[in-house]
Design a protein with these regions (language model features):
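Hydrophobic transmembrane alpha-helical segments in integral membrane proteins
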Residues: 1-15, 131-139
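Membrane-interface helix-loop junction between the first two transmembrane segments
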Residues: 18-38
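Cytoplasmic-side transmembrane-helix entry/capping segments in multi-pass membrane proteins
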Residues: 31-40, 66-68, 90-101
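Membrane-interface helix-loop-helix modules in multi-pass inner-membrane proteins
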Residues: 47-84, 88-96
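Hydrophobic alpha-helical segments and helix pairs
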Residues: 84-134
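Transmembrane alpha-helix/helix-exit interface in multi-pass inner-membrane proteins
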Residues: 136-159, 188-192
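A mid-sequence, solvent-exposed acidic-amphipathic segment
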Residues: 155-192
Length: 192
């Protein structure tokens, strides 16, 4: 019952955060960062508690594909939300929060119980898995930045004046962040 409640809370607040950002996406001042952070923080905390309660069970760890997907989604949501506090990432937020809502709701309907009695902890294996997961998340975020770059570039080439007066980041900033993320993801994947 706790897992169902946490899933509903996380999904609801992801949907609220998504709709808040989408409602003011092309407004000159953009969505209120304070409201977005509050809504997304509640969703992120509920998502984290959902992960803790669904992965760590009394009879072992449940590392099914659904739980690993939920973990990956959580890392991406936390990363993009943290980045959006410093850099404008308004186009990425609805996509990330929307997928977070869909994945948490889908986890209720997809059977996923693969219990491991114990995990053999070797430093090399844990390092490999952690670096690979982190690189995967960073490269997914870089992909989202690539989509954002394409969207802004397309609007600029059409000479859409609405984008000039919007709160969206300059194209060069998005390009620089994209290359930084690609380099970081590639380096982490190489070390993994």
């Amino acid at each position: 019952m706790l897992i169902i409640s946490l899933t509903i809370i996380a999904s609801l607040f992801y949907v609220l955060a998504t709709s808040h950002v989408l409602s003011r996406l092309f407004h000159q001042q953009g969505p209120s960062q304070k409201v977005t952070v509050i809504l997304s923080t509640v969703a992120i905390v509920a998502h984290m508690l959902l992960l803790v309660n669904s992965v760590f069970r009394s009879d072992g760890q449940d590392l099914s594909i659904v739980n690993v997907s939920l973990l990956t989604c959580w890392v991406i949501v936390v990363s993009v939300t943290a980045v959006s506090l410093k850099f404008p990432a308004t186009l990425l937020l609805p996509v990330v929060y929307g997928f977070g809502a869909l994945l948490t709701i889908a986890s209720l309907f997809i059977p996923h119980h693969i219990l491991l009695q114990s995990i053999n902890i070797e430093v090399g294996l844990v390092t490999h898995i952690s670096l690979s997961l982190l690189a995967y998340c960073i490269l997914i975020i870089a992909t989202l930045y690539g989509v954002q770059f394409y969207f802004i570039d397309k609007r600029l080439k059409r000479k859409d004046l609405a984008i000039v007066h919007s709160h969206l980041p300059p194209l060069m900033v998005v390009e620089r962040q994209l290359y930084q993320l690609l380099n970081l993801g590639t380096i982490l994947l190489t070390f993994a």
